[in-house]
From Swiss-Prot:
Keyword field contains Iron: yes
Protein name according to UniProt: Cytochrome P450 monooxygenase ppzG
Residues given in the record as heme binding sites: C288
Family: Belongs to the cytochrome P450 family.
Amino acid sequence: MNDFVFSDIPDILKPMASVEFDDPLTKATGDVLNWTLWLIRNFPALSNIIMRLPSSLVSIVTSSFEGANQMFQVTTSTHNLYSASLPTHATKQIISKLVEHEKTHIGPKNKDCVVQRLLNAHRDSESKISIPTPDATVRSEAIGFTLAGTADPPNILALGTFMAARDPEMQEGLYKELRAVWPDLRSPVPSYNLLHQLPLLRGVVKESIRFTHGVATGPARLVGAGGARIGGYNVPAKASLAVVAAPSYFVHMDETVFSEPEKFEPRRWADNDYSKSLVAFSRGRRMCPAEQFHVEPYETTSVPRSEERG
């Protein structure tokens, strides 16, 4: 995910470079995803107050905001992210320093990474009035991608690997399917377009997404003008407590959509696309734009895991 968002990543942020398999950005992200998102969703006024407190007081109010404080607060820290070591508390300024480094460092840059795309959008645009993307916007997008990439991929990959490991028939099917398109393991991993055509692999990935649910409950939504009637209930317009959401768990476990929903069955996807019923990334105009990006690394990462048995 870091390589997708940034073009130059310091070693300290590469988990595999750490003997502890632990980097400060991942730790902070994990802390954010405990009670923090729940509090922000249901008590936005409380979160606004807490995030304005000095960092020394945040943990006194609630430890749930320590990770968020580390990620979002811009401090006067002078630590260099690209030095040999980095104190954990310096995560408070990680995103800001990474974005600034993307703007100023000399050397090869990945022009297709998220941050470089945002920084150079005004140069690529044909509009004569296009202006540079504000740094605050770039930081916000970088944080969003980092949060999303840290939360879901480990869960989905771990579940898919576990389910395949306990099912010899599934293992054999994946092995044969992959060796048919990748006979020489010394050659590069096949392209995503080719892997996506493999029905069993695609089914394992999508079934893993269905079982892990993504963000289980969507962000708050107020009912529009005129109100609404949902499930037999009248919901008033713009009511401050009228939050309408369909948790993905109940959709993914709906027997009228998925037969035997509690059974991990990758082959169900070969007979039915179920695209509109897989809501881990939500659906509609406001759905997560990273759905296709998420599916691609799951499939390409699952391939080496499956081939290791050979």
